[in-house]
Amino acid sequence: EALRGEGAVLRNLAGERFMQDADERAELAPRDVVARAIHSQIVAEGDPHVWLDISHLPRNKVLRSFPAIAAHCLQQGVDITSEAIPVAPTQHYFCGGVKTGLRGETSVPGLFACGEVACTGLHGANRLASNSLLEGLVFGHRAARAAVAHARRAPIEVTLGSAAGPGCPRIVSTDPHELRMLRTVQDGMHTTMWQHAGIVRSSRGLASAMEELNALSLNLSGAFTGGEHSLEALEVENLLTVAQLVLACAARRKESRGLHFTRDYVHATDSEKRDTVLSSSDVDLQLTRAMPELVSR
């Protein structure tokens, strides 16, 4: 993104620029537009990447402006001052997350969230470039101060390093069969979410993904038959829950807005200009139209 801002251009396998056809701002278009344009080229050409070319700029300028990028690419055998860089979209940022108030407080007393895990509403439907400091620094500072103030009012009555809670001891799985099963479930979830809940979505794809995740959840249930659960199993279970919430939320939005783009509704509509908050109770997903009442004090 920094390279594009400095004048780098995107080219397909034939060496042709394609961003002018996708948006009048060409390479300076918002990241969701650029990602979809690259995705379209990759699908059409059957190649895993396109090319980012900054070789037309003076060598000294490139090395002075992007020393870290130049060094990293050179380690991979690419001299960005004379060669194009193979690039492809990837999961980079999550605009949704745990709903918080202005100080990182959540609907769970004593639980605070900040950074990419939190949904502050700061970025709307599409984060601008180089804008993460607001989440990490500003809301991190606010959440830390609020957490300290809360702890002083209500001291924690648990010894650090003890059990995470009743019936949930901190243990690491040593069962090879369970570890293989967890890896299979996690890999399947990653593949499904990338294919159906990634850059370009559709109603059919989201429904198919939900069916696949439900099947993976059944496979995972074997890890919870005993009285103790490993951290690995709990983590995969939480990942599946979040993935199901993402799918359910995306399926209910009948429009395209920001990072959420669906082939079935390619334009944004005023009727869908709202927040969507989902809560999970076991495996049942419930849609809440209104935001939970969170008051900062």
Language-model features and meaning:
Residues 17-20, 25-27, 37-41, 93, ...:
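Glycine- and aromatic-enriched mobile tails/lids
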Residues 1-85, 146-152:
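An anion/pyrophosphate-binding glycine-rich loop and adjacent beta-alpha core
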Residues 67-112:
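FAD/FMN-dependent oxidoreductases across multiple families
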